């Protein structure tokens, strides 16, 4: 049986989420909210210290940015009965981190009547013991007015910063609809990358984000994903089948689509992502956001092939972005990319894996229609995913085309799949709630 694994960053995020959930918090969002926001909606809800402030990645001539915080676009939807105890997980971006601008963050809101700093400190201490063990002690260290560093003192005498917390400012209170002065609004920010490096003994973020199977296969766990979205279900199913989740590139180089044989010419606008104002990457070559995840997938397949891996089964779930046309807002979607190669993997076995995945998601009425049109694929082994009405479910899979394999240096037959999550969610829901006419 293949090892069941979980990326150390995602393992850490789940540990922290569960630490707050068992103490009464609700997981408001598990990575679904948009990562691209209008530049005029970038606001500050509390006064983070300078070392925790992120510089936004500007897009499309400065009209949009990749978010630097999770709460600003979501906090107004959290209005309701007190206490409010909400948690958000997702990716934020820092323009100063040229090679790895994406960070996994957890942010939270705790609002109720007369919450003193000591009350919040006691709560955070309980949560920290769920993360670091019962010998750990959490304390709030003031860094400036109304702002504290959450310091974890471990049983070996060492200390680590869990995150930052402080009182929400007037804007945070207004967005929450809080007018009563006796109601305190505490906000929380945790850089999951930093905690993951500590828990998994990674000396740098570069090591944390390595995608070599030799490293990722060491992170064994059969614990399910902390979440109940369809993307979470996908992760559990694929992990159970021996697929390893990686974290692919989220900002592509200029030739990404040409390299995977997906770009057909200047007229082909489907594969031109949102442009960065300032290029990122090691050599300043990363210039646009992905419209699909498959270029990143092929990079990781190639990296592992060159490292001598005989068998690779991987997947990635992340956001993709389509630029707005004719003055319209950009479109953001959550996508799934799956890849595999190995002596026991061929077109038939990979197709069977895709069939099992869809069936276990509750999508029984799916059909695979062969096609020789998509140029990134091996045209002898390529399928579109359709429903019973022959409507496209925004999914396709097959062999990676010869040109792409040559461009990436992949010396074996390899296979990939590309899905959008929302159409799968809608299809699964329609089948789950379907009532035959004779039973209505």
Regions inferred by a protein language model and the residue ranges of each:
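TRNA-recognition modules of translation machinery and tRNA-sensing kinases, especially anticodon-binding
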Residues: 1-440
């Amino acid at each position: 049986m293949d090892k069941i694994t979980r990326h150390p960053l995602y393992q850490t995020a789940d540990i922290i989420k569960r630490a707050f959930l068992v103490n009464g918090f609700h997981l408001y969002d598990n990575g679904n909210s948009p990562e691209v926001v209008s530049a005029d909606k970038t606001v500050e809800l509390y006064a983070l210290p300078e070392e925790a402030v992120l510089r936004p990645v500007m897009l499309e001539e400065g009209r949009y940015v990749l978010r630097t915080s999770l709460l600003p676009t979501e906090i107004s939807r959290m209005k309701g009965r007190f206490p409010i105890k909400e948690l958000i997980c997702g990716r934020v971006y820092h323009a100063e981190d040229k090679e790895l601008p994406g960070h996994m963050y957890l942010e939270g809101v705790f609002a109720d009547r007369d919450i003193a700093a000591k009350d919040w400190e006691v709560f955070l201490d309980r949560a920290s013991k769920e993360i670091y063990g019962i010998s750990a002690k959490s304390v709030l260290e003031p860094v400036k007015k109304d702002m504290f560093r959450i310091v974890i003192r471990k049983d070996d005498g060492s200390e680590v910063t869990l995150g930052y917390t402080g009182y929400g400012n007037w804007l945070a209170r207004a967005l929450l609809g809080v007018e009563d002065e006796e109601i305190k609004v505490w906000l929380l920010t945790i850089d999951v990358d930093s905690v993951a490096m500590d828990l998994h003994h990674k000396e740098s973020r570069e090591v944390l984000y390595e995608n070599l199977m030799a490293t990722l296969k060491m992170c064994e766990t059969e614990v399910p994903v902390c979440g109940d979205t369809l993307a979470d279900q996908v992760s559990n199913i694929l992990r159970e089948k021996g697929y390893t989740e990686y974290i692919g590139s989220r900002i592509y180089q200029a030739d990404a689509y040409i390299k995977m044989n997906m770009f057909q010419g200047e007229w082909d606008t489907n594969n031109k992502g949102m442009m960065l104002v300032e290029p990122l990457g090691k050599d300043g070559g990363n210039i646009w956001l992905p419209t699909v995840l498959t270029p990143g997938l092929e990079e990781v397949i190639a990296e592992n092939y060159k490292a001598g891996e005989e068998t690779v089964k991987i997947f990635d779930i992340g956001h993709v972005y389509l630029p707005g046309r004719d003055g319209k807002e950009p479109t953001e979607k959550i996508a799934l990319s799956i890849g595999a190669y190995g002596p026991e993997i061929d077109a038939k076995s990979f197709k069977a894996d895709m069939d099992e995945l869809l069936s276990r998601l509750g999508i029984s009425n799916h059909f695979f229609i062969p096609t020789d049109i998509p140029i990134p694929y091996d045209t002898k082994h390529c399928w579109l995913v359709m429903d019973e009405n022959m409507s496209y479910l925004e999914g396709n899979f097959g062999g990676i085309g010869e040109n792409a394999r040559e461009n990436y240096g992949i010396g074996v037959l390899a296979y990939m799949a590309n899905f959008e999550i929302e159409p799968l969610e809608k299809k699964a829901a329609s089948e789950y709630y379907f009532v035959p006419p004779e039973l209505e």
